[in-house]
Amino acid sequence: AEKALRAKLNSLSLVQPEGTFRTARKEAAKLFDRKILFTENPRKVESVVFTKEGYRIKIEAVINGEQKTLYASYKAWKRNNLYPDDFTKKYQSVAYAMDAEALYLSVGLINTSYKEEYSLWVNSEDKVIATWRPNVTYLPEEPDMVWKFTGTFE
């Protein structure tokens, strides 16, 4: 029984973000090395700058008025500590993937089943389109549990 339990525990993992590229191509490249200012959104992400650092992405964001720096690894969870003084949301793990048009980020709160997914892409008018999809939320439901917001380049 113990052997079966260990095998089961070793097989458990959160789903990785969609996308097959680790480096930006075509339209997705427009998201990098530029400050993006977002419209109002459920996660209170005010701005973000994505920077490639090897096979990981550095994310410098202003979230609810606070400057945060975190990292995402390609289809692998990278642990971050965004709220060191709040044990209830202390550690987040972030993974990313891309396709030719979009950047996909998955964020999981360690030691919980909470996960949220972000998709970002640039439309033909040079506007950033973003979606946020949590697996659970306190917010009123949206169709398909997906919230949409936009951003502009500074």
Residue ranges and their predicted role:
Residues 1-91, 98-101, 108-154:
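Catalytic loop of the DD-peptidase/beta-lactamase superfamily, centered on the K-T-G motif
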